[in-house]
Amino acid sequence: MIEVIYKDEKQTAKGNEESFNLPKNIRQIGIPNEKYRIYIEDYVYTFLKKIAEKAEEEEKGAAAVFTGEIKWNSGTGYLFIRGALTAEAGEISAEHVEFSDLTWQKLHEEIEHYFAGQEIIGWFLTQKSLQMEVTEGVQRIHMKLFGGEKALMLMDPVEKEEAFFCYDNGRLLRQSGYYIYYEKNPQMQAYMLEKNPELNQPEQELVADDAVKTFR
């Protein structure tokens, strides 16, 4: 797999639509295509790997919801994944994911609390020995819960495989590459800290990065 690291290179997406800055410090995985450019923040990526490891230990599936924003420029969709929240949805597998009204309510409350101003832009599914392809079941779940423009990430914690999928011509198609970017992300750090109660020890003076150290 191709991996390229760029540092401190300010890039701007320019076209017919409004221009916007791209992340400066990035790591390219694979070869991103021209229709969709996926940027996932490193704290988010670290959190997802931890979810996958825990799911493997507990021998069950797990899901999360992505927050961030989607921008379009010159026919290219730019997905900026800035946050991720675990989805408590009962039994989860590649054939069954069901979000109850209570699940959605909790997710929206947490988004408002931790990731205010961001929108749901996709979801994450992990399971032991999960195939890196979209089955009819996964396609059905995606369309029912999220809809076309949203992205999907699959991760197999055993084989250490992962892949992004975006909706195109009526199907979720695997993306040939994506970017991991690095920047301060206090919203995600706060969420990660909240999900690690063992860090809340009164005798210690904690900083937000302790959450990430625990995950990594």
Regions found by a protein language model. Name each.
Residues 1-121, 129-211:
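N-terminal beta-strand/alpha-helix entry module and adjacent surface
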